[in-house]
From Swiss-Prot:
Protein name stated in the entry: Kallikrein-4
Catalytic residues in the record: 71 (charge relay system), 116 (charge relay system), 207 (charge relay system)
GO cellular component, one term: extracellular space
Lineage, uppermost ranks: Eukaryota, Metazoa, Chordata, Craniata, Vertebrata
Organism from which the protein derives: Homo sapiens (Human)
Modification after translation (UniProt): N-glycosylated. The N-glycan structures are of complex diantennary or triantennary type, which may be further modified with up to 2 sialic acid residues.
Amino acid sequence: MATAGNPWGWFLGYLILGVAGSLVSGSCSQIINGEDCSPHSQPWQAALVMENELFCSGVLVHPQWVLSAAHCFQNSYTIGLGLHSLEADQEPGSQMVEASLSVRHPEYNRPLLANDLMLIKLDESVSESDTIRSISIASQCPTAGNSCLVSGWGLLANGRMPTVLQCVNVSVVSEEVCSKLYDPLYHPSMFCAGGGHDQKDSCNGDSGGPLICNGYLQGLVSFGKAPCGQVGVPGVYTNLCKFTEWIEKTVQAS
């Protein structure tokens, strides 16, 4: 399944004016220098599909709710759960679910991607299993140096599509370094990870995908600087510890 085109290319010029070098949204995200995930080792991973093409990722955080990046917003969604390969028809243990209600964070700032998260309500609850399972959101904010796992189906470093879900470990970068690298775009709703000498990174096909730290959902793929996988240039993630109250209230109210 091919990734859709970059939905935020319309404001690339604005971003280039703000920061030396061009930036790219995670919404065509590739996993750089990662490897095949163990099958169904990330049972919370969701694929947001439109016209049979992956356009973003998401994370199952409740039997009827998926968390994703706000810049992935659409009027309706087909969401794949329990998937390892996007090429397999009716993969055992998988489920395709429709969704028509999504709630973007009220302070989401599209040009700058601050507060870049939204909740998508599935039309029906899913039954959790070995291949489909929700994950808890971290209540503690990330610590610099922590090793975390990011996953996705986007393009590989060689430009080819992976046949199965890809995983890569990246380290959290300090707020001081992150804010300097992405000034003036940086916002407290963001944090950085990656940018090490191993050039491991998330990048263009996977906005809204999960960053898992210590078994908890710590962040969502948001954006980064092109080309991906540069030494000293980490990717940017939505800092979910800042939004636990909003997420809980939104789920309860709907």
